[in-house]
Every structure is written in structure tokens, then in C-alpha cells.
Swiss-Prot record:
Compositional bias annotation for Low complexity: 178-212
Pfam families (alphabetical): NusB
Keywords carried by this UniProt record: RNA-binding, Transcription, Transcription antitermination, Transcription regulation
CC per GO annotation: cytosol
Keyword GTP-binding attributed: no
Keyword Transcription regulation: yes
Gene Ontology terms for molecular function: RNA binding
Name of the protein this chain belongs to: Transcription antitermination protein NusB
Family: Belongs to the NusB family.
Lineage: Bacteria, Pseudomonadati, Pseudomonadota, Betaproteobacteria, Burkholderiales
HAMAP family: NusB
InterPro entries assigned to the protein according to its UniProt record, in alphabetical order: NusB-like_sf, NusB_fam, NusB_RsmB_TIM44
Protein's job: Involved in transcription antitermination. Required for transcription of ribosomal RNA (rRNA) genes. Binds specifically to the boxA antiterminator sequence of the ribosomal RNA (rrn) operons.
Length: 212
């Protein structure tokens, strides 16, 4: 983030950043579901919280004014934003044991992606665990560093057997998926899981249609 985009002393996010965080364009906009868009805006809002410590109401007002927000599932966005911020201590307590470094050493994008994943594992049982995993990998790919998504994958894939135990056990028994990889082996953990998650992604779109 440039000096011009840093958070002002007033605590309100900068007015000039109406385009939000810069995406790599890893996924075409037309292919994104309303919930996928909600996760993207939640990620941007949580980034503001992690970097600037801004008030949640100020962050929310700013984010809702970003271009394209009207295409997002605002209810899901709101649940992720407020749920993650309100539960951040508990979320970090689950994430920290899966890290091979301190929490301060992971990027805000990776941190926010993990928050979203853990929160959805816990509170969104209608979203298959593989969809949650794949969506958070995509968030890290679009907005994070080169290999950040591999780290997000390893941590969330390590937590899924605990937070979605029955679902993961049933899924892996049927498909013979590999066991979860520790964060230190993140470079080898992504491909097989992401491929399987793609098969389940249609469930998230179906949830959008049912909600509509």
C-alpha cells in the first residue's frame, strides 16, 4: 500500500481508494457468484481492520461504497466482516498452532483469508468445506503475494478435519484425498485440494440462487 493510500489519523479509510485492493484478475468477474464477491469485499474490509485498526462501522461504510458492491451478497459480506472481527481472538487461537511462523509474520491478506475460511467452517454449514477452502485460496491468489495461497491452503486444510470433521471424513473416504499438510509443506499442498474444490464450487452458486 502506498503512502498516499495509508489510513489517516481520523480513523476513516482513505476516500481515494474507491477501487479497493488491486486484484490480479485470476478469476473473471463474470464467473464469480454473489457470495464470491461478498468474500472479496469482506477481505478488503478485514484488510483495512488489520492494517489500520479502523472502526468497523467506518470500514463498512467505506467498503459498501466501493465499485461493484451492489453485485455482492451483502448479508454474507456483513456476516463475514462482523463475525471475523468479533471473533478474531478465537479465530487466531485456532490458526496459530497451524503456523510455522508468528502471526505478525503473515501478510494481512493471508491473515484475512484464513479468518474468512475458519469463520465459514464454523458458521456456514451450508457451504461445503471444499468450497470454503477453494474460495479462500482464490482470495489469496487474487489479492496476495505469489505463494500466499499455498500457505492459506495448508492452514485451512489442516483445520478442516477438526472444524468439519464428519464432512471431511466422509468426503475423503469417498475420494481418497490426501491427509492435511502442515504449513511448512504448503508448497505441495494446493493442487489436489484445489482441483477437488472446483468440483464442489457449484454448490455456492446454488446457495446464491436459493437465497435470491
Amino acid at each position: 500500500m502506498s503512502d498516499e493510500q495509508s489510513t489517516p489519523a481520523s480513523g476513516r479509510p482513505p476516500r481515494q481508494s474507491r477501487g479497493g485492493l488491486t486484484s490480479t484478475g485470476a478469476r473473471k468477474a463474470a464467473s464469480k457468484s454473489n457470495r464470491s464477491r461478498a468474500r472479496e469485499f469482506a477481505l478488503q474490509a478485514l484488510y483495512q481492520h488489520l492494517v489500520g485498526g479502523n472502526d468497523v462501522e467506518a470500514i463498512d461504510r467505506f467498503t459498501r461504497d466501493l465499485s461493484g458492491f451492489h453485485k455482492a451478497d451483502s448479508v454474507h459480506y456483513d456476516a463475514l466482516l462482523r463475525g471475523c472481527i468479533n471473533s478474531q481472538v478465537d479465530l487466531d487461537a485456532l490458526i496459530a498452532p497451524k503456523l510455522d511462523r508468528t502471526m505478525a509474520e503473515i501478510s494481512p491478506i493471508e491473515h484475512a483469508s484464513m479468518w474468512i475460511g475458519v469463520y465459514e467452517f464454523q458458521h456456514c454449514p451450508d457451504v461445503p468445506w471444499r468450497v470454503v477452502l477453494n474460495e479462500c485460496i482464490e482470495l489469496a491468489k487474487e489479492f496476495g503475494g505469489t505463494d500466499g495461497h499455498k500457505y492459506v491452503n495448508a492452514v485451512l486444510n489442516g483445520l478442516a478435519p477438526t472444524l468439519r470433521a464428519a464432512e471431511v471424513e466422509h468426503d475423503r473416504a469417498g475420494k481418497g484425498s490426501a491427509p492435511a499438510q502442515p504449513a511448512a509443506k504448503a508448497d505441495t499442498a494446493t493442487d489436489a485440494v484445489a482441483d477437488a474444490a472446483t468440483d464442489a464450487a457449484a454448490a455456492d452458486d446454488a446457495a446464491d440462487q436459493a437465497a435470491g
